[in-house]
Design a protein with these regions (language model features):
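Short, charged/polar micro-motifs that form catalytic or ligand-binding hotspots
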Residues: 2, 40, 44, 63
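Inward-facing hydrophobic residues that define packing positions of alpha-helical scaffold repeats
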Residues: 9, 16, 51, 57-58, ...
């Protein structure tokens, strides 16, 4: 079940990257999050186990008029999706919450048609 959801999340991320940002499905998205100070901060929060706080911060700071924020959000959820289920559970987060957050972000940016069930 969780492996299936992991693959679904990754497929959604790749679809949004391809359509919204013109990035091919084979290109890695990690460079944006690693190159920005904001992305590094989110990544450190994930590594420190502050996943809920990192997601809250992202939602609060997000600028829907700037597609670079979509890239940062996609990178954030991709990084979370690569975490183990045990790590997520240890920090009160779940793969289902990754799925929900990703769908919410896509809806905010008008790409909900790419991630609908």
């Amino acid at each position: 079940q969780q492996d299936w959801l992991m693959r679904q999340i990754e497929a959604m991320i790749q679809a949004v990257l391809a359509v919204a940002l013109g990035t091919s499905a084979n290109e890695q998205t990690a460079t944006q999050i690693e190159d920005s100070s904001y992305g590094k901060m989110l990544e450190k929060m994930i590594d420190d186990g502050d996943i809920c706080a990192a997601e809250d911060l992202l939602f609060n700071d997000l600028d829907q008029s700037d597609l670079s924020w979509l890239q940062i959000a996609l990178d954030f959820y991709s990084k979370l999706n690569n975490c183990s289920d045990d790590y997520l559970a240890m920090h009160d987060f779940s793969r289902e919450e990754i799925d929900q957050g990703l769908r919410y972000i896509c809806t905010l940016f008008g790409y909900d048609f790419l991630v609908s069930n």
